[in-house]
Amino acid sequence: MSGEIVVGSKYHPLALVSAAPQRACERGGDRGSGPKRSEACKTTTTFALSQLPPGTWTLGTIDWHTRSQPNRTPKLSGRINVPVHRGSILRNDNDDDDDRSSTVRVWLKRDSGHYWPSICQYMPAGATSMHYCVETRQLFVGLDNGSINEFILEQDYNRMTAMRDYLAHQARVTGIIFAADFEWVLSIGRDKLFQLHSSETGQKLGSYQTDAWYTALQFDAQSKHAFVGDYSGQIAMLKLDNSGVTFITTLKAHTGSIHTLAWDSEKQLLFSGSFDQSIIVWDIGGRQGTAYELQGHHNKVTALCYASVERLLLSGGEDGVIVCWNMAANRKETAAWIESDVCQACGRPFFWNIKAMMDQRQLGLRQHHCRYCGRALCARCTSQRIPIPAMGFEFEVRVCDQCHIQLKSENQSSLASFHDAKHSVIGMDLDAPRRRLLTIGQDRIIKIWDVSALFQ
């Protein structure tokens, strides 16, 4: 047996963590153009078909060779074809998933390089979220019925023992974090509740309710703050202690539901990925309300992983693309959009400015904005397109003529690289020290990537 573990479940697995698909839909091929996009020109596939209980599951490896950027392309080192919603890396060459029969499975990597299920734990309901603590081997599984089951995995990962059940929620559990330093279990659910429990006693310590489903959860152990994203696109910042939960503030910027959060404990940066196809970087530590926008996906952003030492952010989305963002680069805050009744360049009125339309005897125009300066302009005055990597715009965006001249004279080299995941990503987990990335797709496949090239 070699040393890597992945744990998962029908809705949510654990050690290299990924998530189970809502439907099977293989989405191969190119996902659109972008700076530094890797073009797969040769694929070598090795498969070993194993006879497993009901159905045939495919275990194998795929090595990708690319014509462009050969030293900056992640290599697919493992693949498991099985119904999964979540998954994680346990740092032991094992993998956990759950299938349609409401089971949690631990997959061990054999000397042959193939993954084999060593544990198949049947659950009273479908598993929808999961958290695994490597140091204590504690596994917390959130269920579709709102409860949380706690397990202990044996050292050989061939057995898991049930320890405690938490009656935490009245609807599906959508996120769990175990804070080992404080022995806290943080959870969120579709009942619009954030719950804080003690793993030592099993007692509830506090809760907080909002007006929308909670969909994403992150925790900063240093400051004891929890960040909770919801279906309306807002992020609540909560202060936790043994006496309960205190609301601090709300972060508002996204126009779509929050699906994933990541945290940089050193720089105190919060990363949020949304259904509005954008990523926002919130400078929590700076306390100035600064937020940077990252635009590199053509569909919903569903997963974020951050490597603090290398200062790299990995994002995955339903467009089937993994984007590697250089967060060590100097970035500029997104310009605020100015509102005006007339074009701030040529003075022609917009269509709601009836008085100016009558005075100038012309039809009103539609309002647009320059993405660099934020001025309100008409279409004719914002006809130029250019990428602005320093502001997070990796694709061409609308700018005014004046800003276009300025930007063309500056270096606009891309600050991100784009890689085809070959499936629509719904979950990711990163083991940065070992340079391993796990992705789970809507095609019900777990993929384990060697991302050493991205960290060079």
Q: Each PLM stretch: what is its role?
A:
Residues G8-Y11, D98-S101, G142-N145, D181, ...:
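Conserved strand-to-loop turn within each blade of WD40 beta-propeller repeats
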Residues T302-A329, M428-A432, R436-F455:
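Blade-level signature of beta-propeller repeat domains, shared across WD40, Kelch, NHL, RCC1
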